[in-house]
Amino acid sequence: MSGNTGERPFGDIITSIRYWVIHSITIPSLFIAGWLFVSTGLAYDVFGSPRPNEYFTESRQEVPLITGRFNSLDQLDEFTRSL
């Protein structure tokens, strides 16, 4: 037989008014904050990923594939120089 840990049962937690008052504010706030983080472009700046219009430049329209096994660093340097 399992012992009592003294924790509140989950059923009591999700049926309490206090739980829903707190979570009815925090869950939509997190959703809105995430939407703003992505829609303003801040996510691109924070993680350093290129924006959708920056994947291909005017000078380079091909996909930057690494094709050589032994000269991959040279190919990477060439791709980054063209940016």
From Swiss-Prot:
GO terms for biological process: photosynthetic electron transport chain. With its partner (PsbF) binds heme. PSII binds additional chlorophylls, carotenoids and specific lipids. It is found in: Plastid, Chloroplast thylakoid membrane. GO terms for cellular component: chloroplast thylakoid membrane; photosystem II reaction center. Signal peptide: none annotated. It is a single-pass membrane protein. Belongs to the PsbE/PsbF family. This is Cytochrome b559 subunit alpha. The lineage of its organism: Eukaryota, Viridiplantae, Streptophyta, Zygnematophyceae, Zygnematophycidae.
